[in-house]
Amino acid sequence: MPTTTQIQAWAERLRHAEATATPIAPLREEITDNDSAYAVQLVNVQYAQSQGRRIVGRKIGLTSLAVQKQLGVDQPDFGTLFADMLYGDDEAVPLSRTLQPKVEAEVALVLAKDLERPDTTLVDVISATAYVLPAIEIVGSRIADWNIRFIDTVADNASSGLVVLGAVPTALNALDLKLCQMQMTRNGDVVSTGSGGACLGHPLNAAVWLARRLANLGQPLRAGDLVLTGALGPMVAVNAGDRFEARISGIGSVCAQFEG
């Protein structure tokens, strides 16, 4: 197990990469186990909190087989969302806020109840969900050229960047999320398609996985938390001036407009 000093040093390296907009070499040659990678992530989450940033939820990453194939990984991970990451529908998003940005369309849940049990069930998640929103997650990597494997993205807060949320909530009981179809356009051209079934078979399966994982860590999901359940299709690179629109059947649409 790495020493506390080593964990702190890896975490600082990632912070420096973000602060200087200079991606770094992969960390997987130095961080050799998943627990250590999550320890690095936690150090930077705690550092962010010490700087006044407010946690508003969690994201689940690597739930789509298409995204897993793109990145060469084979299991989900999770990261932390902060209030200053969130943008509203069609709000201008500065491109400079994210290193090597890419976008993916997702289903977002907002919780009405805590999910504290390590044996959380699908029924528990359904009961705890206040509503769903369409979302565009803007992922970013502090690792050069997106040359990542599981350990790299975990340490890097699951490659979190920003989130653009739709503004019209939909009740879960009005939806079959597995059958929801997603289409995302960039400047009017279709660039990504998928469905709810691409997200661990069902977006709520991803939420169950996350609730159990966090409960076991003593960091359970709480009422009011935002949960990004994972990509519904392949992620797409972003350029200055791009406008993305994601439409998810039954849930609605959300737009992300990028400034230079």
UniProtKB/Swiss-Prot annotation:
Q: List the disulfide bonds.
A: none
Q: What class of enzyme is it?
A: lyase
Describe which pathway this protein belongs to, using the record's wording. Aromatic compound metabolism; 3-phenylpropanoate degradation
Q: Which reaction does it catalyse?
A: (S)-4-hydroxy-2-oxopentanoate = (2Z)-2-hydroxypenta-2,4-dienoate + H2O
Note the superkingdom of the native organism. Answer: Bacteria
Q: Which cofactor does it need?
A: a divalent metal cation
**Lyase among the record's keywords?**
yes
Q: Tell me one GO molecular function of this protein.
A: 2-oxopent-4-enoate hydratase activity
One GO cellular component term, please give it. cytoplasm
Looking up Pfam families in the UniProt record yields: FAA_hydrolase
Family under the similarity heading: Belongs to the hydratase/decarboxylase family. MhpD subfamily.
The UniProt function text for this chain reads: Catalyzes the conversion of 2-hydroxypentadienoic acid (enolic form of 2-oxopent-4-enoate) to 4-hydroxy-2-ketopentanoic acid.
* Name of the protein this chain belongs to: 2-keto-4-pentenoate hydratase
Q: Which organism is it from?
A: Comamonas testosteroni
